[in-house]
Regions:
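Bacterial N-terminal signal peptides that target proteins for export
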Residues: 2-16
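Bacterial signal peptide processing site
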Residues: 28-31
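C-terminal motif of bacterial Sec signal peptides marking the signal peptidase cleavage site
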Residues: 24-26
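Short, solvent-exposed mixed-charge patches
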Residues: 220-222
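Predominantly extracellular/luminal regions of secreted and cell-surface proteins
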Residues: 71-115
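Proteolytic processing hotspots in large secreted/extracellular or virion-associated proteins
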Residues: 37-75, 106-172, 209
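Surface-exposed loop/edge segments in extracytoplasmic proteins
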Residues: 169-182
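C-terminal beta-strand-rich structural cap/linker in extracellular carbohydrate-active enzymes
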Residues: 191-214
Length: 222
């Protein structure tokens, strides 16, 4: 299948990040007290839970999902076992709204025309699933858009997991600068989820006090 240009450029980086994030848990235990990391993510029941049939397909659900939506209507988009909730009127006008760091909380006019959303899912059958959305857009700060990522490796899902935002060079825990964006884990239903304010890339990985580099040639500091 053909991936969007930005998705193709990051495909290898997301795969590498999933592997290196395993180092994070071990090294975090050496550098910090275990209690601090386990308190990082709050446990909460996910309002979105995939069916057993949807979970059974995990492993074949990596790939590209495309949806043509009416932004004036509330949407719940199924991404294999994961999901995205977009309330009516949440999408900022794609052509006229600002986009980028520092703009996520700016007011905006809503998108009114139907549009196509593309989501590229990778590593769905692991405990480090990722998704990348196109086009680049942001959501009205007065609306709450939620991303729910299913984690299939049940043995490793705990309160150290964070849903990171990834740009072209690194992944960031956005909750350090915006309390609205803190992650939650549902260890019973094996979900990691949080509110998001823009379309970019997102990946589930262990908590770290530093950004995660997408360039495996850099010192990740784990």
């Amino acid at each position: 299948m053909r991936l969007p240009t930005l998705a193709r450029s990051r495909a290898k980086s997301f795969t590498m990040l999933a592997a290196t994030s395993l180092m994070l848990a071990a090294c975090a235990g050496e550098a910090t007290a275990p209690v601090a990391s386990t308190l990082r993510t709050q446990e909460r029941t996910s309002p979105f839970v995939p069916t057993d049939a949807q979970r059974a397909l995990v492993g074949v659900t990596d790939g590209t999902y495309s949806f043509t939506i009416n932004p004036g209507q509330t949407q719940t988009l199924q991404l294999g076992a994961s999901g995205l909730y977009i309330p009516a009127g949440a999408i900022c006008d794609v052509a006229g709204s600002s986009y980028g760091m520092g703009t996520w909380n700016d007011a905006c006019s809503p998108q009114t025309e139907p549009m196509t959303i593309t989501a590229v899912v990778r590593n769905a059958a692991t405990d480090h699933p990722s998704v990348e959305f196109q086009p680049a857009l942001r959501f009205s700060p007065s609306k709450q858009v939620w991303l729910y990522m299913a984690v299939t490796n049940q043995a490793t899902l705990d309160a150290t997991k964070v849903l990171w935002y990834c740009n072209d060079t690194e992944c960031l825990d956005e909750s350090t600068t915006d309390g609205d964006l803190k992650s939650y884990v549902d260890t019973k239903n094996f979900m990691v989820f949080r509110r998001i304010k823009h379309f970019s890339g997102y990946v589930v990985a262990e908590f770290s006090t530093r950004p995660l580099s997408l360039d495996v040639g850099l010192d990740l500091g784990f």
